[in-house]
Each structure stands twice: as structure tokens, then as C-alpha cells.
Amino acid sequence: MSKRTFQPNNRRRAKKHGFRLRMRTRAGRAILAARRGKGRVELSA
């Protein structure tokens, strides 16, 4: 029997998909800009 693949961890979630990580790269900033343009309430994890 295999275990469930999603093991929630807030720290890992923020490190991999967080706002500061998005701001770090040009591509990440583009993601945030796209989400702002779309009117997302939450921009990142």
C-alpha cells in the first residue's frame, strides 16, 4: 500500500511557492503580474 503523496507543510509550501520566491526572479514577477491582472485575491502561497 502506497502512502498519500500530499503531506502538508506550511514552511515547505512557502519556500517553494511563496511571495518572496516569486519576487526573486523575473519569471516569478511575471507570474505575480499575471495574477494581479486577472484579479486574484491571493497572489501566492
Curated annotation (Swiss-Prot):
Superkingdom classification of source: Bacteria
Pfam families (alphabetical): Ribosomal_L34
Bridged cysteine pairs (disulfide): none
Keywords: Ribonucleoprotein, Ribosomal protein
Cytoplasm recorded as keyword: no
Family membership noted in the UniProt record: Belongs to the bacterial ribosomal protein bL34 family.
Name of the protein described by the UniProt record: Large ribosomal subunit protein bL34
Organism name: Paenarthrobacter aurescens (strain TC1)
Gene from which this protein is expressed: rpmH
